[in-house]
Amino acid sequence: MLDIKWIRENPETLDKALAKRGAAPLSSELIALDEKRREHVGKVQAAQERRNAASKEIGKAMAAKDMGTAEKLKAEVGELKDFLAHAEEDERRLSKELSDALSTIPNIPLDDVPLGKDESDNVELRRIGNPHNFSFQPKEHFELGEALGYMDFERAAKLAGARFTVLKGPLARLERALGQFMLDLHTTEHGYTEVMPPLMVRDEAVYGTGQLPKFSEDLFRTTDGRWLIPTAEVPLTNLVAEEIVDMKGLPLRFTALTPCFRSEAGSAGRDTRGMLRQHQFLKVEMVSITDAESSVAEHERMTACAEEVLKRLGLPFRTVVLCTGDMGFGAQRTYDIEVWLPGQNTYREISSCSTCGDFQGRRMNARYRPEGEKSTRFVHTLNGSGVAVGRALIAVMENYQQEDGSIHIPEALQPYMGGLTRIEKAA
């Protein structure tokens, strides 16, 4: 959430930032709401002060046996109480109107984010690894998985409908191995603390990270009002909600391997075959909580941690910076890491690493107190996939496929596979 004080002082900056995102100007509307609220608050405060003063004057008039004045003051206090009973409710309503309006405004892109309308305007930063030249036509992961007998979309559809997968045998173990490998890397070498968070959260948590109120259609909700997490970013970031964290302990770095649940609203017709776009999938998430001065450097560090996963797996990838029109709602800047999929002959996103500034910290009311200062500041937050486990499985299958349809297991994963070096067709 943006600071209304900042918006009052920088209306043109806000509207220019919204224009970069392809959105209409909103500063005038927001400032008008704020002025209406501030004017009303002024009236309420004046009425409260007069009520308190008149109440004291009643006592003085009674002591002086000036009953006429006392009665007039009592009548005035009664009128003020009646006014305040309605006015304080109006104040809450006006404050909510402003808060609701602010909650739908996206974050302000950093100055170095490239301008653009959509993913075609994203800017490539680097490529690591060269795509393998196959001596045969490489297959897509779902062709390989079904031929091996370990990937079953038909039974998954029978159980749950479209966009689900059943993995069996060594492919199920390979997905588990990938998640464990990523967690071990991030916790033992990258300094992240592993967390096993709830998979269902309250409204406040999803609001804090920015999925609510604007993107509720992308989420699954239980009958008792909880939300299935679309990413572990939600519970990990909200660990510090409504808290003042010790600045000496910053940065806080959390990681988790969880199922994620998404309705994929608006994705009709996209990636309908295979595991690329699922309602349920595994992902390793990284979250950092920092002070204001450290978040830019932390963004580079987090992205490097995600890239290291793919380097260890020997998977070719590229890193791009998203343009203003392709960034997520809460991000100030986002790096996408795209892995090479030879079956599709293209790069596909496998990780997205974003710095959000104090946007989420303000929504969560998560703060820290700089050393030597009495006042607090909102924390800066960052999140990144480290990485999407299902997509990593896809990438391993396609990049390590053999002409006979078997899958070579990358060396980094073999210790997690009981020494198995190849996945072959089920007997």
From Swiss-Prot:
UniProtKB keywords: Aminoacyl-tRNA synthetase, ATP-binding, Cytoplasm, Ligase, Nucleotide-binding, Protein biosynthesis
Reactions mediated catalytically: tRNA(Ser) + L-serine + ATP = L-seryl-tRNA(Ser) + AMP + diphosphate + H(+); tRNA(Sec) + L-serine + ATP = L-seryl-tRNA(Sec) + AMP + diphosphate + H(+)
Signal peptide extent: none
Enzyme Commission number, as recorded: 6.1.1.11
Positions that bind L-serine: 231-233, 285, 385
One of the record's GO molecular function terms: ATP binding
SUPFAM superfamilies xrefs: Class II aaRS and biotin synthetases (SSF55681), tRNA-binding arm (SSF46589)
Enzyme class: ligase
UniProt-listed PANTHER family: SERINE--TRNA LIGASE (PTHR43697:SF1), SERYL-TRNA SYNTHETASE (PTHR43697)
Family of the protein in this entry: Belongs to the class-II aminoacyl-tRNA synthetase family. Type-1 seryl-tRNA synthetase subfamily.
Primary role: Catalyzes the attachment of serine to tRNA(Ser). Is also able to aminoacylate tRNA(Sec) with serine, to form the misacylated tRNA L-seryl-tRNA(Sec), which will be further converted into selenocysteinyl-tRNA(Sec).
The record's note on its domains: Consists of two distinct domains, a catalytic core and a N-terminal extension that is involved in tRNA binding.
Binding partners and assembly: Homodimer. The tRNA molecule binds across the dimer.
Name of the featured protein: Serine--tRNA ligase
Classification lineage: Bacteria, Pseudomonadati, Pseudomonadota, Alphaproteobacteria, Hyphomicrobiales
